[in-house]
């Protein structure tokens, strides 16, 4: 069993807590612009002093409402300025933030609020509040629901009014009583299989994440940088990086308006973004599709290959004269347009949650956007490894965040321990016992470390497919390759206890229209009408053959089915971070899976 450790050059003391930085910034740099928030569509500056005032006001309101240290308080909302303020206010009074994705179903909301025994909930809209109201009979601990942005009084205004009579000394006493070992947040896993479990993270866990990522990404996490957060703050990656940015006095903006990101980029002009790989895949695929629709597909493919070659050349030394000339040409024709679409100043991104893929990483670096890919789980407070400013290897998930250790078991499973690793699942001793071996957290992921200390994720242990012939196949390699094709939205590899590997494939609805036009298909034709069309099947078959080049013959996809519908979060096949719920898909499309193994 191989073991690796990176010591921390920082410390987390017993009396440290996450909320203290709010009031340190207020004291040391009150006029620094720490946030920008949208007010009536206009980005408005929020200084450290103003943010602290809002957080203090909300915290005093929580005290007035009877929230005690250790109480669970839920935020059921999309990403917004108020989310960040409420989170820090909850932490400041010693309570525990319980995030809920704004897209969660009533049953998911019921489970989280009931299991956590939340005493107070913040609902983003009237509709979110109404959903909770329908569940109150099952939620005896829940005392009140405040609405962040509804038709009635706003939550922050209500808290300010409630807390107006509370002495500031009460908040000071709460802060003084906090210990780094105290719980800070209870985050429920997104649940690709089974019922979500509550991961308890302490102030110490979050501070190790904040300070560790500051060491790894010092030039990104520094005053003067501008971070646009559009991932759900209920996701540990977005939350942790937002806290790291706040600690580093990066100016942070929030939006949940994913459909209108490009106009927001143009106005906010981020220097850094945080996202999951599917977003980077979609940006690339959309650019390729648009170029193809305009008759410039060949130019884009040449430009993309040149960007990849350029990035790889820097790993090997430096680009040659011809490659530099090609890169300069495509920079004028293609790359500058992509950078402009991101606001013109964006030079870096942080990616996690799923594998990015080496080709995509090289493409973006060749265009001028370096993606620092990391690896982690909710149970590790987000990143436990990450590519770093002075240690970057595209195609890997980087090196250990300082203050942590990593083991690779004999079967390839990654085991971790250290400052970012959680202490256990909320009120679930059995799951906690199963998750740890001799103090090491079993991630369930498979990986390998190269001679330079960079980690690569090779698959998910629970997702390993064992064919009838006994071949172990990690589906992620094939699925990532397939999703890289602009026409493919999602792919799920199947074949457990079957004679060969197959795949279910969905078509990207945004790319489908352009494909129909280029291939002289009827505009009104749906995927179900063309699922067996020879041209569509041939296009997908080419993508499958390309993906198969990444694996051995025994692991390759022999047959596939094009599904009539795409996977979505609304219809239950995807988690909020766009991971496929394999058990849901297997059950819902069992007939299609069996058809793969039926002789034609």
UniProtKB/Swiss-Prot annotation:
Keywords annotated in UniProt: ATP-binding, Fatty acid metabolism, Ligase, Lipid metabolism, Nucleotide-binding
Enzyme class: ligase
Reactions it catalyzes: a long-chain fatty acid + ATP + CoA = a long-chain fatty acyl-CoA + AMP + diphosphate
GO molecular function, one term: ATP binding
EC number: 6.2.1.3
SUPFAM superfamilies recorded: Acetyl-CoA synthetase-like (SSF56801)
Keyword Phosphoprotein belongs to the record: no
InterPro entries: AMP-bd_C_sf (IPR045851), AMP-binding_CS (IPR020845), AMP-dep_synth/lig_dom (IPR000873), ANL_N_sf (IPR042099)
Family as reported in the entry's similarity comment: Belongs to the ATP-dependent AMP-binding enzyme family.
Protein task: Catalyzes the activation of long-chain fatty acids as acyl-coenzyme A (acyl-CoA), which are then transferred to the multifunctional polyketide synthase (PKS) type III for further chain extension.
Record protein name field: Long-chain-fatty-acid--CoA ligase FadD15
Organism field: Mycobacterium marinum (strain ATCC BAA-535 / M)
Lineage: Bacteria, Bacillati, Actinomycetota, Actinomycetes, Mycobacteriales
Gene symbol of the encoding locus: fadD15
